[in-house]
Regions:
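Topology signature of small-to-medium multi-pass alpha-helical membrane proteins
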Residues: 2-153
């Protein structure tokens, strides 16, 4: 019984380590691509501002999440978790609205839940939240939210 538990724990630890590496690489790349695209389109001025403004907001979220991934302290943890929750909410809202009002939403990073970016804008914050709430990550960031104890019972 203990060996199976240890095997599962080791497999999960490997997954969590891999997820952290993926996030550390993918967030800056997505910030660069989304931010560059939004900046070029906004500076050109031949576009509607809402879609590109939303893409710029997404790029800002990605940059903030990257900062939280780099600074492994409680402030970095709370910063990243907050922005990942916001990013998830924005992806779901804008992604849903892009099917109902495609002309208004336009071509944002969150359109159709991030279809233009391989659905990374939808999957990435969920993976990030799973990573940030894993016990190993909480220990790395030296975070022990009291409210989290209610979910561990």
């Amino acid at each position: 019984m203990t060996n199976k538990h240890n095997e599962k724990e080791n497999a999960l630890s490997g997954f969590i380590a891999a997820a952290g590496t993926i996030l550390t690489i993918s967030y800056p790349v997505l910030a660069l691509s989304t931010g560059t695209r939004a900046s070029v389109r906004l500076l050109r001025g031949d576009t509607t501002y809402l879609p590109d403004g939303l893409s710029a907001l997404a790029a800002t979220f990605y940059i903030i999440a990257t900062i939280g991934l780099i600074y492994r302290n409680p402030k970095g943890w709370y910063l990243s978790v907050s922005v990942l929750f916001l990013e998830t909410i924005c992806t779901l809202i804008v992604g849903g609205l892009s099917f109902v009002y495609p002309d208004v939403i336009g071509n944002t990073a969150w359109r159709h839940f991030g279809a233009d970016y391989g659905y990374f804008p939808l999957v990435q914050p969920l993976l990030g939240l799973a990573w940030f709430f894993h016990p190993q990550t909480l220990a790395i960031y030296n975070v022990n939210p009291r409210w989290l104890a209610y979910f561990r019972k």
